[in-house]
Swiss-Prot record:
GO terms for cellular component: cytoplasm; ribonucleoprotein complex; ribosome. This is Large ribosomal subunit protein bL36. SUPFAM superfamilies: Ribosomal protein L36. GO terms for biological process: translation. The lineage of its organism: Bacteria, Pseudomonadati, Pseudomonadota, Gammaproteobacteria, Chromatiales. The gene is rpmJ.
Length: 37
């Protein structure tokens, strides 16, 4: 899980999701997981 100021899609499988006020990226590739913080 990467924590970044700006989250971006890395590949076409990445989805940007807002959960409990935080922006997250979920993907089938585990290395692409990010959250904004």
């Amino acid at each position: 899980m990467k924590v970044r100021a700006s989250v971006k899609r890395v590949c076409r499988n990445c989805k940007i999701v807002k959960r409990r006020g935080t922006v997250r990226v979920i993907c089938t590739e585990a290395r692409h997981k990010q959250r904004q913080g």
